[in-house]
């Protein structure tokens, strides 16, 4: 790393290649009066004056950046006529058209309205940003877009004045990787997986206070987990408390005075996951039709969320050895690295079978541990109270698995 850095420092920085944009001349149409009250609402929320007198930037808000191909093609025809002849995508997953003359605003509004693109969305709705998540990204842990839609539905149905949240943004990533830029979100979330019993449950880490503002830029802080199913309710309670606080509309003051402490209290309120038999919904991700799972993830694909899940199992295995809980330590060790082979066990018995198949049979773990695994299988299927094992052997298994993990590369290869 140091050698490569020194080499880069010795080289001349590359010349920035800027694309030359054509200068466009077009006739400004005469302004047509409008009696549509919606125009004034649209103007207030979606139109922003430029520094150049008489010209405006027009926002075209999209929910999570979604727009159909047919509608986009029709919008392209509109863009050819007005402003600079092009539209631009924003980091907030919306579109903007620049250089709209004040005389063009009314006719542009009517044209966008006909395309259902003049919606005066509250800024907190259009400022929700989500990465693609596990729906198409193999690095993703959770379905971040599904959660975003659930949050939009929840806060829209709640008794909140969404127009009074100013420019608060919510950034949601499907895993700890920052594709949605959750570290700079006023409210940031990233997906994770947690074992509840023998089942995986989608969770999110809540982070607060991110800010992108030149020298005042700072990263959001927070490490508390709550199940994905409870995030919309958490969000509604948190935003309601902010709206009713003496600090409103100053979000930073709210966080400093009471917001962070309140968030911790809400996490405690919403972190509980009921048993599968009582409420299966917690074991499904938002917009998912099948139980939450990391099965299918294999070598060459990984994210920080997978390492986090492995770390928890291994830490628990070490702790179980110290506490003399040898059965638990053996099962946790066997389960911890199954995700590296694209496997997920439905219960402890299956975890032990898969461990034998993918680790002992392949030579990754020494054959001498097979008897311990078979003994554990017998106890799990018959009577856990009868489990007898040598603490030294169980401790050795934990260390072998830990060593495998420590020497694993970023692509889950040993």
Predicted regions and their residues:
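Peripheral terminal and linker regions in Fe-S/redox and tRNA-modifying enzymes
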Residues: 1-320
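Long, charged low-complexity segments
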Residues: 308-319, 334-414
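Extended, hydrophobic/aromatic-rich amphipathic alpha-helical segments that build helical scaffolds
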Residues: 329-332
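Hydrophobic/aromatic side-chain positions at a characteristic register within alpha-helices
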Residues: 321-322, 326
């Amino acid at each position: 790393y140091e050698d490569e850095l020194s080499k880069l420092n010795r080289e001349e920085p590359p010349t920035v290649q800027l694309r030359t944009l054509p200068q466009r001349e077009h006739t400004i149409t005469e302004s047509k009066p409008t009696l549509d009250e919606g125009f004034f609402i649209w103007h207030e929320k979606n139109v922003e004056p430029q520094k150049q007198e008489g010209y405006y930037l027009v926002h075209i808000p999209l929910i999570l950046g979604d727009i159909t191909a047919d509608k986009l093609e029709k919008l392209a025809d509109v863009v050819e006529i007005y402003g600079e002849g092009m539209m631009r995508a924003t980091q907030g997953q919306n579109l903007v058209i620049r250089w709209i003359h004040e005389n063009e605003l009314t006719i542009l509004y009517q044209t966008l309205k006909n395309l259902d693109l003049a919606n005066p969305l509250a800024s907190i709705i259009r400022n929700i940003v989500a990465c693609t998540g596990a729906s198409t990204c193999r690095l993703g842990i959770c379905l971040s877009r599904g959660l975003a839609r659930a949050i939009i539905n929840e806060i829209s149905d709640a008794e909140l004045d969404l127009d009074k949240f100013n420019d608060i943004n919510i950034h949601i990533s499907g895993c700890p990787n920052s594709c949605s830029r959750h570290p700079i979100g006023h409210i940031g979330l990233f997906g994770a997986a947690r074992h509840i019993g023998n089942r995986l449950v989608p969770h999110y880490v809540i982070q607060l206070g991110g800010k992108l503002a030149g020298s005042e830029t700072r990263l959001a802080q927070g490490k508390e987990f709550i199940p994905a199913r409870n995030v919309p309710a958490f969000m509604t309670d948190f935003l309601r408390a902010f709206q009713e606080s003496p600090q409103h509309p100053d979000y930073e003051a709210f966080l400093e005075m009471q917001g962070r402490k309140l968030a911790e209290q809400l996490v405690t309120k919403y972190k509980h996951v009921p048993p599968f038999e009582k409420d299966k919904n917690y074991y499904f991700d938002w917009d998912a039709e099948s139980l939450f799972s990391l099965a299918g993830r294999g070598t060459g694909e990984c994210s920080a969320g997978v390492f986090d899940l492995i770390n928890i199992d291994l830490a628990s295995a070490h702790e179980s050895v110290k506490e003399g809980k040898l059965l638990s330590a053996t099962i946790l060790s066997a389960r911890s690295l199954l995700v590296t082979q694209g496997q997920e066990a439905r219960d402890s018995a299956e975890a032990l079978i898969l461990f034998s198949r993918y680790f002992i049979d392949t030579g990754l773990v020494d054959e001498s541990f097979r008897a311990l695994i078979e003994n554990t299988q017998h106890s799990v299927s018959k009577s856990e109270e009868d489990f007898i094992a040598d603490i030294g052997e169980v401790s050795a298994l934990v260390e072998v698995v830990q060593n495998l993990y420590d020497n694993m590369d970023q692509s889950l290869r040993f």
